[in-house]
A protein has these predicted regions:
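Extreme N-terminal, non-catalytic leader segments
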Residues: 1-27, 68, 283, 290, ...
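Residue-level signature of catalytic and energy-coupling elements of molecular machines
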Residues: 14, 25, 51, 59, ...
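Walker A/P-loop phosphate-binding motif and the immediately C-terminal alpha-helix
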Residues: 16-53, 171
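Phosphate-binding loop that captures ATP/GTP phosphates
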Residues: 40, 46-48, 52-99, 103, ...
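Phosphate-binding/switch loop-helix module in NTP-utilizing enzymes
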Residues: 94-143
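Conserved catalytic-core segment of NTP-binding enzymes
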Residues: 122, 127-244, 249, 257-258
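C-terminal boundary of histidine-terminating zinc-finger modules
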Residues: 262-275
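Short, amphipathic alpha-helical "lid/cap" segments that border enzyme active or binding sites
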Residues: 272-287
Length: 301
């Protein structure tokens, strides 16, 4: 009863709750989750990240919070605080070391998730971003049934056909839970090469499969060419097919790999860079969908 009341209190203290899902692993879902949280924090919002990936928690490393320990006071768990003041809760904080596996059966894992929801002292938040393991199993089901007033799900995919197939399952899954789909994000969508040449010089670069990409340098000699590493547009076409919003595309950026390893997210290290700008646009699209639902009473499916 006490935990149930606490969950209801969370519903009042946290204005917006956004679930971030992907049907397939390896699409950069945790990178997107942390990026969304940091982009929101850059805009002045109070933000938290709830890492629900019990067996493979990566969010603390990406947020520069490795080896941190959670503070417990009067039976309440206090989140760690990362870049830009973002609060973080994760199973990683409870492990003896990063090599310790979590070998739990379903009921124990689900109990931990409910504890993360009901026993954490988040304080007042504008946004809680909830990061899940890949797939449509117990974790998102438990959160959807336990956490009140969820604004909706963000589905992360990459342009490959296999990832798109699984993202379609995530959309259908959200409909079965009656949780709105805020939209689809296409990650790793094109790799932009920037360079310097003679002013107005014509540039030709060979991309994957030998495809030629042509552009012309500007009056200062700067040029940009975007290569389709994994092709582009699959996320948008899937969103259109299912009648859900397309929130935007995020570029393939090797800096995310370095940032994830170093614990300094690309948005923090280059707040004016192309990736940070792309995340800001996606965040605005998410806020727009939430605002439309609140002001017009629309049901987003």
């Amino acid at each position: 009863m006490k935990r149930k009341m606490s969950m209801q209190e969370i519903g009042r203290k946290i204005k917006h709750k956004v679930m971030v899902l992907s049907g397939k692993g390896g699409v950069g879902k945790s990178t997107v989750s942390t990026g969304l949280a940091l982009a929101l924090a850059q805009q002045g919002h109070a933000v938290g990240i709830l890492d629900i990936d019990i067996t493979g928690p990566n969010v603390p490393k990406m947020m520069g919070l490795e080896r941190k320990r959670l503070h417990v006071e009067q039976g309440r768990i206090h989140p760690a605080q990362g870049h830009l003041g973002v609060k973080v809760i994760s199973m990683a904080f409870l492990l003896e070391n990063e090599d310790t596996p979590v070998v739990w059966r379903g009921p124990i894992k689900l109990g931990a998730i409910q504890q993360f929801i009901g026993d954490v002292e988040w304080g007042e938040l504008d946004y809680l971003v909830i990061d899940f393991p890949p797939g449509t199993s117990d974790e998102p089901l438990t959160v959807a049934q336990s956490l009140p007033e969820i604004d909706g799900m963000v589905i992360v995919t990459t342009p490959q056909d296999v990832a798109l197939l699984d993202s379609r399952k995530s959309i259908t899954f959200s409909e079965s839970l009656k949780v709105p789909v805020l939209g689809v994000v296409e990650n790793m969508s094109g790799y932009t090469i920037s360079g310097k040449a003679q002013p107005s010089m014509e540039i030709e670069i060979a991309g994957p499969g030998g495809k030629k990409h042509k552009t012309t340098a500007d009056s200062d000699g700067n040029f940009n060419v975007t290569l389709d590493i994994f092709k582009q547009g699959g996320g948008k076409s899937t969103a259109e097919e299912f009648g859900v919003p397309f929130l935007g595309a995020l570029p393939f950026d090797p800096g995310f790999v370095r940032g994830g390893d170093d614990g300094v997210h690309r948005i923090v290290s280059e707040p004016e860079g192309a990736s940070a700008i792309a995340f800001a646009k996606v965040v605005e699209a998410i806020k727009s969908q939430i605002g439309a639902s609140e002001s017009q009473g629309l049901e987003i499916i």
